[in-house]
Amino acid sequence: MVDRVSATDATVSLINDLKEIHGPLLFHQSGGCCDGSAPMCFARGDFKVGSRDVFLGVINDQPFFMAEDQFSYWEHTHLIIDVVDGRGGMFSVEGPTGKRFLTRSRVFSDEEATFLSKHPARRAKDLDGIEGLKT
């Protein structure tokens, strides 16, 4: 199995803190104008995922999605979600913590790319079993 997204230890720790405050979360990586391409973190019930958004996987048991048009640029890379000092996105729940999520990446190896070509990413509309997910 090849993961499309992973989290650093610092990210896992911040997610744990945020879950205590906000409950179940979700992440969305967009190419939005306001917060650039920063990964945004939302309370799961507060954000409606687009039906064509791409499900990349989970980090610390929280689903991670990307806008379909962005995925066409990033599909050959493994995303590593990290945490750095700074102000989070305007609507992202980590904003008040003095930390922000940051996407790092690496290109998939040939072996990983071959595996993923046989296991395409799913769209949000095709998912079942993610409690509280709105599409």
Task: List PLM regions with ranges.
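Domain-level signature for proteins that mediate thiol-based redox and metal-cofactor handling
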Residues: 1-135
